[in-house]
């Protein structure tokens, strides 16, 4: 599978073309230059492409009535809607088995009416890790008292991914620090996250009281571990149908 994307006139992005989105792609540039916007647009288009694959799967199975509709504007969150203009263009292309499939957003409209044969169908999980992830420890410790509060779509998506991860992962090693994060749950109380040493009997501390670096990195490591080793594509596919 090969991905490419062209983005024109989207917020601070005047024209961006990435011919091959690699598994590890690093963006380097000045602050507020639009790096996070690029990633949000890629995640958005990947999500739409995933849903097009599901729709194609159902259509190929002779289920002609789609259980969902793709409305581009309803998928724009955290200020992205205000970055769209009449001049905005997005072209997202996936090449698989020598065949190319392109989603387009032009003239304020999404063009996603493509059908993908069974041999080219793919299903994946896209995840955007919010830059506000350092707030996860304090948010998790006050999960009940802050119910209904809103820190933005992408933060809550990241927090939900972390919450799902720590439903499964009860001990996450942070070997680069000789530490581990332990997860405990008791009744209806919020989960308790503690940081403990891998080598000695140092007194454990709650994640929310750990250093800023640990507060930022521990949730990220847990999320990556979850999607790499514990995530169930079968369950996710059934939820998406």
Regions from the PLM with identified roles:
Residues 1-43:
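Pre-Walker A-like glycine/lysine-rich segment at the N-terminus of P-loop NTPase domains
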Residues 6, 46-240:
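Phosphate-coordinating catalytic segments in nucleotide- and nucleic-acid-processing enzymes
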Residues 22-26, 130, 241:
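Short, proline-centered helix/strand-breaking motifs
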């Amino acid at each position: 599978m090969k991905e490419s994307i062209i983005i024109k006139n989207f917020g601070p992005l005047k024209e961006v073309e990435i011919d091959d989105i690699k598994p590890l792609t690093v963006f380097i540039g000045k602050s507020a230059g639009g790096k996070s916007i690029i990633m949000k647009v890629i995640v958005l288009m990947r999500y739409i492409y995933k849903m097009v694959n599901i729709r194609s799967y159902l259509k190929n199975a002779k289920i002609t009535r789609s259980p969902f509709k793709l409305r581009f504007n309803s998928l724009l969150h955290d200020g992205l809607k205000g970055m769209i203009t009449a001049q905005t263009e997005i072209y997202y292309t996936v090449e698989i088995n020598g065949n190319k499939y392109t989603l387009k957003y032009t003239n304020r409209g999404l063009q996603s009416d493509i059908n993908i044969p069974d041999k080219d169908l793919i299903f994946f999980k896209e995840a955007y890790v919010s830059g506000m992830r350092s707030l996860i420890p304090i948010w998790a410790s006050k999960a009940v008292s802050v119910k209904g509060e809103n820190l933005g779509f992408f933060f809550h998506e990241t927090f939900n991914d972390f919450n799902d991860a720590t439903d499964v992962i009860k001990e996450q090693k942070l070997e680069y620090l000789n530490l581990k994060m332990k997860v405990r749950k008791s009744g209806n109380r919020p989960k308790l996250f503690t940081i403990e040493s891998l080598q000695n009997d140092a007194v454990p501390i709650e994640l929310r009281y750990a250093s800023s670096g640990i507060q930022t990195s521990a949730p990220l490591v847990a999320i990556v571990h979850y999607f790499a080793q514990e995530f169930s594509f079968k369950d996710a596919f059934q939820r998406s149908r």
